[in-house]
Amino acid sequence: MILGQKEKIMNSWIFRVVVLASAVLFISSVQAETNVDKARDALAKKSDDADSTRQLEEVFQAAEKNYSLLRSGGKSLNYSLDYSYISDSRIDIDIVNNVVRNLDINPSATHSFTNSFSFDYGVLNNLTLNARLPLSTRYDTQQSLSVTDWGDASFGLRWQPFAYVPGKATVTVSSTLSTKTGVSPYEIDNRLRLSTGSGTYSVSTGLSVSKVLDPIVLFGSLSSSYSFEQNGLNQVRGGRVLKTVQQGQSFSFSSGFSYSLSYDTSLSISTQIGYSTETTLFFSNGTSASSPDSVSGSMNFSLGIRVDPKTIMNVSFGFGLTEDASDLNMGVSYPIDIGAFTW
């Protein structure tokens, strides 16, 4: 009897131990599966965050081309239509022996429409070449003048010295050569014809920085432009013959932010400030005339919209903050699919 009771007690304890051990093992397995699920969810969230950040950057870069590059071998063709309105007054004077002669004030209200095709090619993953060809139409409502002609073609490159790292600031260095293929303002009669170009060759360099702080992209850029001296001119201005032009050097700074309305739509707000040194005109009679240094400022807004998985359209609007800036700017750009073409 005593042995039977001991066996029953022993079996009872063994049963309890087995049940307790099974419960512990079951709970441990459930916790392990839960931890694995949490780890998978965490990894999935990180992957989704990287994808959404990249989408935001793509929409932003479509609006701000200075901050974007193509992969090696990549090609893109972009069409843009820009409108600007400038209203000012031009004063032509001739000063002889401290006496002002031929004083002439010419009011001007110019509407400009520019159709541009820009082609980009990725030489390396961090180096992109680009070319831009504009066709400009201008109207002066005060003088009843109009012109449609090519503008100044330009060629440039964009280079990222550091590899792209999600979440880190992106640095882009750019350089552009602008030609004088447009109608020069120094080779026409300003009273009878309008210009579509700058009249000189110029070289510009710039540095751009952007950083994604979802849902905001902060960006800023600093650039400088130098225009080469233009000789061999023969333009009559204020009773004198213009022979040489030395345009001043210019500097520009812009900064702003792009806010993500969604991962397919972003609104960019930026301001730009420019400073240009004096421009000197040399005439055939040995005299010269210089314009004062100028400061220009503008406020710009742009909306980038992803209309399909591979196409982002950009609409922009801006206005001048100083007298030397354009009164009004508007534009729209749209990429053209050239995937079927190979070179």
What is the predicted function of each stretch?
Residues T137-R138, S144-L242, S290-S291:
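Outer-membrane pore/translocation modules
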Residues T34, K65-G74, A109, N126, ...:
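Short loop/turn motifs that connect adjacent beta-strands in outer-membrane beta-barrel proteins
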Residues S72-D88, L192-F283:
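Detector for outer-membrane/organellar transmembrane beta-barrel domains
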Residues Y79-Y85, A131-L135, V173-T181, G220-Y226, ...:
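Transmembrane beta-barrel strands of outer-membrane/channel proteins
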Residues H111-N115, S146-A153, A169, G197-V203, ...:
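Residues that define the transmembrane beta-barrel architecture of outer-membrane proteins
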Residues L77-L81, F117-V123, A131, F155-W159, ...:
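Residues on the lipid-exposed face of transmembrane beta-strands in outer-membrane beta-barrel proteins
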Residues A32-I95, A340-W343:
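Outer-membrane beta-barrel biogenesis signature
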Residues R90-I105, R240-W343:
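Outer membrane beta-barrel transmembrane domains
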